[in-house]
From Swiss-Prot:
Belongs to the G-protein coupled receptor 1 family. This is Galanin receptor type 2. One of its GO terms (biological process) is galanin-activated signaling pathway. The gene is Galr2. Receptor for the hormone galanin, GALP and spexin-1. The activity of this receptor is mediated by G proteins that activate the phospholipase C/protein kinase C pathway (via G(q)) and that inhibit adenylyl cyclase (via G(i)). It comes from the Eukaryota.
Length: 371
């Protein structure tokens, strides 16, 4: 949890006196829903990608890494954040006080950097489908993932000393141990490197991708099928970009207001803090939902896993049926190498199918200094 948010929560709880606080019940329920949907959904994403060694393309490796970061974020952040609204004391000890916040920021940065890498991968795949093949290899993707986690460790390392357990009045709390100027500088760095810069990269790459898709005209396959494919890719890009920006913008705007503006500690601002937490945390659980809605290959993978689980169930549970769509169900990847979106090759030669913008890419999350 961010230092300013921590103080705000303490002050707000003191305002409530000893009366019943609705957030003590409602907020943990929302967190429980986010936890269940996020844990199950992201675990399912990993299962679909790992089933039969399907994560072999660069995009699938990035999506796999994003799922790992999202799942770790859900497991390491949500349960502890929920206890803030139900327990007066920090009951998990000094070691977890430091470790939990370190893991939170580690997964935040890993998620945001992965999203930026996915956007670059998609831009190269769409804009330079032939020339980027030598660059977009699984080996290079694994190297990029290693770099992502290395940078995440670098930027999250200071949080091992940022928080500490201490006594406040008669309460045991886990709160920032740094001075206000150091916290302000650290929170500003977190905003810049884990939100602002990734958003700029996402905006630039997706804008250029959209521009290329919108302006490129296929003289042969310019019929309704090509237009439908173009609209589908455009819609997917807009969805993932808007989700990321909308889910995290309120939280970071609030943090900036706390440090650089006027943000009085009232019940209304406390409610805004809670809302910003819920919206930002929800981004990690809606990603698998977006995958399922947009990617038919993910849906096929989900059905295949569902069918496999039901086959292992006792026969007396035969009333629970997992219906498979007709056709070939062998596809388990979130992104196949083939696509119905046809592009003009870079050399004004014959038309070649271009790697598709992934039907499974979405923008997570990434970062929450208020955790």
């Amino acid at each position: 949890m961010n230092g300013s948010d921590s103080q705000g929560a303490e002050d707000s709880s003191q305002e409530g006196g000893g009366g019943w606080q609705p957030e003590a019940v409602l907020v943990p329920l929302f967190f429980a829903l986010i936890f269940l949907v996020g844990a199950v959904g992201n675990a399912l994403v990993l299962a679909v990608l790992l089933r039969g060694g399907q994560a072999v393309s660069t995009t699938n490796l990035f999506i796999l890494n994003l799922g790992v970061a999202d799942l770790c974020f859900i497991l390491c952040c949500v349960p502890f954040q929920a206890t803030i609204y139900t327990l007066d004391d920090w009951v998990f000890g000094s070691l977890l006080c430091k470790a939990v916040h370190f893991l939170i920021f580690l997964t935040m940065h890993a998620s945001s950097f992965t999203l930026a890498a996915v956007s670059l991968d998609r831009y190269l795949a769409i804009r330079y489908p032939l020339h980027s093949r030598e660059l977009r290899t699984p080996r290079n993707a694994l190297a990029a993932i290693g770099l992502i986690w290395g940078l995440a460790l670098l930027f999250s390392g200071p949080y091992l000393s940022y928080y500490s357990q201490s006594q406040l009045a008669n309460l045991t709390v886990c709160h920032p141990a740094w001075s206000a100027p150091r916290r302000r500088a650290m929170d500003l760095c977190t905003f810049v490197f884990s939100y602002l810069l990734p958003v700029l990269v996402l905006s630039l790459t997706y804008a250029r991708t959209l521009h290329y898709l919108w302006r490129t005209v296929d003289p042969v396959a310019a019929g309704s099928g090509s237009q439908r494919a173009k609209r589908k890719v455009t819609r997917m890009i807009v969805i993932v970009a808007v989700l990321f920006c909308l889910c995290w913008m309120p939280h970071h705007a609030l943090i900036l207001c706390v440090w650089f503006g006027r943000f009085p500690l009232t019940r209304a601002t406390y409610a805004l803090r809670i809302l910003s937490h819920l919206v930002s945390y929800a981004n990690s659980c809606v990603n698998p939902i977006v995958y399922a809605l947009v990617s038919k290959h993910f849906r096929k993978g989900f059905r295949k896993i569902c069918a496999g689980l039901l086959r292992r169930a006792p026969r007396r549970a035969s009333g629970r049926v997992c219906i498979l769509a007709p056709g070939n169900h062998s596809g388990g990847m979130l992104e196949p190498e083939s696509t119905d979106l046809t592009q003009v090759s870079e050399a004004a030669g014959p038309l070649v199918p271009a790697p598709a913008l992934p039907n499974c890419t979405t923008l997570s999350r990434t970062l929450d200094p208020a955790c």
